[in-house]
Amino acid sequence: MSTKPLFLLRKAKKSSGEPDVVLWASNDFESTCATLDYLIVKSGKKLSSYFKAVATNFPVVNDLPAEGEIDFTWSERYQLSKDSMTWELKPGAAPDNAHYQGNTNVNGEDMTEIEENMLLPISGQELPIRWLAQHGSEKPVTHVSRDGLQALHIARAEELPAVTALAVSHKTSLLDPLEIRELHKLVRDTDKVFPNPGNSNLGLITAFFEAYLNADYTDRGLLTKEWMKGNRVSHITRTASGANAGGGNLTDRGEGFVHDLTSLARDVATGVLARSMDLDIYNLHPAHAKRIEEIIAENKPPFSVFRDKFITMPGGLDYSRAIVVASVKEAPIGIEVIPAHVTEYLNKVLTETDHANPDPEIVDIACGRSSAPMPQRVTEEGKQDDEEKPQPSGTTAVEQGEAETMEPDATEHHQDTQPLDAQSQVNSVDAKYQELRAELHEARKNIPSKNPVDDDKLLAASRGEFVDGISDPNDPKWVKGIQTRDCVYQNQPETEKTSPDMNQPEPVVQQEPEIACNACGQTGGDNCPDCGAVMGDATYQETFDEESQVEAKENDPEEMEGAEHPHNENAGSDPHRDCSDETGEVADPVIVEDIEPGIYYGISNENYHAGPGISKSQLDDIADTPALYLWRKNAPVDTTKTKTLDLGTAFHCRVLEPEEFSNRFIVAPEFNRRTNAGKEEEKAFLMECASTGKTVITAEEGRKIELMYQSVMALPLGQWLVESAGHAESSIYWEDPETGILCRCRPDKIIPEFHWIMDVKTTADIQRFKTAYYDYRYHVQDAFYSDGYEAQFGVQPTFVFLVASTTIECGRYPVEIFMMGEEAKLAGQQEYHRNLRTLSDCLNTDEWPAIKTLSLPRWAKEYAND
């Protein structure tokens, strides 16, 4: 029997003319409801005259009725406040107590003396007072003493700068609804961005307020850092892997220019076009701009490869237009065939630090006014990376690769092991290479930067054709015998035109002993300034892992469809499903700096799964094999949702967030698919719904979901769980005291007033839940969630599973509520602690067991013995 008193109210229907009735008792909800119904009938009134009983906050008053006795006069004196949970005295009414004194409490103590020492909540004060209370505090200030409150009012005019007070008053509608925790973080980060607010601009402060509160919770830390650097960004752009894509800093594009993925694509296309003609990247000719748009529309290599690399690169939007154009323009021909080489190349040439004022040499390279090579990162020995090492004349790439393979890496393991004569040979080759580069540089200086030619010639040059007055006749690629691909193709015989090798859109790497330069056509390298730096470079023979990896999603659906597959919760998931903490989980996410142990109500489902912390689903992988935890990080995920998953997701939304159901799902009407008119109506309906982004469920599925929901509401405790005030999809973070690992969970619903946790499940066979829960490790979920709740609230909650059947029985969809026994909960607690220790050991030793041992099943052993 519950020791906590429960106060019930049954409102009377207006048509009945009966008064409302209340009852309180130290019992559970169902027993108290039954007692109330019995006493109403016993008093001669009809149950049909009243609505169903609801639980409210327990009132603390003098004229409380006796326990177990109904009171029909209670509503004459008291009424529910706006939250529909707290009782308050009606205006003009007085408690029904002859000994009532307005200045004493229920214990007869003088409230005047007590109120002198009471802590007053800060939430009810004016916004400037709440702001000032959080200023300079490491933790949120929720209550202050009476003297402290007076001090805040006195210090309001002195300690709160006028510009801050004005900004707060201008954004009252935006700041006033904030909880104390959120307001404290805003005050803290505002102090970081504007340490001297008296010298700050009012517009900047209000702009920061808007950007900060409009940003996702997990992006506010990065947003604050960007503002501290002077980058007045309005939001944080992220790459596909979740890293910060940048773009908020000032570049050579000009102040106020919004640099996004579209402008980045134009810069990359400009670099591709700059390979065949000289451009003014800051003042494009209309013909050049038209050709750039065509390159973007074609979306072919090398443009598509370089664009994707800049998009997935952390901070890829920070670079200037000059460095982007120059890096694409000067990239080795054909490097896009192996995307990993593009990543390696960009890591070497993107050396820019002042994005607003790029190096003049880089600008000249981008505009075609200089033929100097791209500056690259300098190694510890003071030399550029291997990409700029020239190759001795007469040595092929294969020979050099073989030599480097047979010789140990002396630079890495030994110091100064190269003979002096070998060093002099390298120096002489380097001098020859630099001499060739200088000659080409001088030749290009004599070419006019702009030629008065028509658009047709410009477009012809952009296609790689030689055009008088535009193309450089001294360029090695125009030497005698070397023509464009179009010219070569036109001059070939008909039999050669149909050769399979000529249909290759891009150069194909052949396994030949000698490699020909794409610019000069010669083998061996060092025949022109271009092949000296590229041909035979051993650096380009290695394959490097790409930095961006596909983020795999963990799956732990709460469905038990088909209990014969006890581990089908890892089969797939919907990233937008709100039914579970484990659904759509993203492994190895970007670490969110501001997440600290506590409970958060405003984190979206997607950002929760992209945040840090170990979840119950990941513990399931550790329990299976630790390597499965790593595998799930890297394995691709098929995000196609099954029909069963859509039904389960819709049911969870209907139960937990009914107000969101219409925003996420559309119940289709019934169509007569036997007729052409019905098929056309269905097709038109689906096309209309496709633009909404909502999930369409059939009329039969919608009817089934509603029946399942009504089945839940028909169960008294189920109705109480659904209607009780609580929080759905809240996120709880805590640290495991034994291993120090950050843990997290996302309960379907918590009811803090009574310390209950509800988890909604659907199953095809509700009877098997009593035994199949162990295969699904729901006892581990119970213990894991309960310990997380206790870490936040200091109380072990009552954890229940509300299980709804998707299979009809006797015309109804069964609904039952289960609770783990003490033995099962203890076993789950021991199990998840064992999993955390295993994870801790794997992280410390970097050893992840992956092999599973297969044993003969019982029937096979019996067969072998026969």
UniProtKB/Swiss-Prot annotation:
Entry's EC annotation: 3.1.11.-
Say how it is used.
Has been used to construct a 2,4,6-trinitrotoluene (TNT) biosensor strain.
Induction of its expression: Transcription is increased specifically in response to 2,4,6-trinitrotoluene (TNT) and its indicator compounds 1,3-DNB, 2,4-DNT, and 2,6-DNT.
Compositional bias ranges of the Polar residues kind: 417-426
Basic and acidic residues bias (residue ranges): 562-580
Per UniProt, which keywords does this protein have?
Answer: Exonuclease, Hydrolase, Nuclease
Q: Name one GO molecular function term.
A: double-stranded DNA 5'-3' DNA exonuclease activity
**Which Pfam families is this protein grouped with?**
DUF3799 (PF12684), Exonuc_VIII (PF06630)
Where is region (Disordered) located? 368-426, 545-583
Instruction: Sum up the protein's function in the record's words.
Output: Is involved in the RecE pathway of recombination. Catalyzes the degradation of double-stranded DNA. Acts progressively in a 5' to 3' direction, releasing 5'-phosphomononucleotides. Has a strong preference for linear duplex substrate DNA and appears to be unable to initiate degradation from single-stranded breaks in DNA.
Miscellaneous information on this protein: Encoded in the Rac prophage.
Q: How does it assemble?
A: Homotetramer.
The protein in question is named: Exodeoxyribonuclease 8
Q: Which organism is it from?
A: Escherichia coli (strain K12)
The beginning of the lineage is: Bacteria, Pseudomonadati, Pseudomonadota, Gammaproteobacteria, Enterobacterales
UniProt lists the gene as: recE
